[in-house]
Amino acid sequence: TSSGRMSLSWKSVSNANGYKVRIYNCRKKKASSIHLSGRYNNNYYTNKSANTAYLVSVYSYRWVNGQRIYSIDSDAFVCTPRTLTTVSSTASTLTVKWSKLYGISGYYVYKSTSSNSGYKRYATLSANAISVKVKSLTSSGNTYFYVVPYRVYKGKRYTFPHNIYRMYTRYYYY
């Protein structure tokens, strides 16, 4: 998703007559469904709320004796990408902020001093959190973060897509 525009695609199923796309709004706790006929009709576009988590389920179906017979669903959680911003920074602390995402269970915050490796979970935050204060930063000036929204669904934790951001620590020289 991007700015509320949801673009879905999936692999075609060889013996399918079509697909059912079910989109569950995790904030409103309501679902909507649409049937797409045709084996190769494996893309769907729609507008959704930008700061809301969704559970998307795609089922292939086949007509048997005048009834749709569905496959097992394929679930994925999606949301608008989070943008992280530096609210305040000093030589040893940094406060990172993001826009609230509705319909999730919480956030995992990971940090590293390298963009490619060494990420460790720094914090687990509640669903209402919109910022985190990071202490004991290194002197390199670069700290890389990613904030991963998650949702508990049927007893299992599912994580959402995320981006890695580089934040700079502000230094004061006397």
Residue map of PLM features:
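Short S/T/G- and acidic-enriched coil/turn segments that sit immediately N-terminal to beta-strands
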Residues: 39-44, 128-133
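Pro/Thr/Ser/Gly-rich low-complexity, intrinsically disordered linker/stalk tracts
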Residues: 1-15, 67-103, 139, 155-174
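Hydrophobic residues at beta-strand termini and immediately following loops
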Residues: 36, 125, 134, 167
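Beta-strand-rich modules
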Residues: 45-68, 134-155
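Extracellular low-complexity, O-glycosylation-prone stalks/linkers
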Residues: 13-34, 101-123, 129
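Residue-level signal for short segments within beta-strands and strand-turn junctions
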Residues: 12, 23-27, 60-64, 111-115, ...
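Conserved hydrophobic/aromatic "anchor" residues
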Residues: 10, 19, 54-56, 61, ...
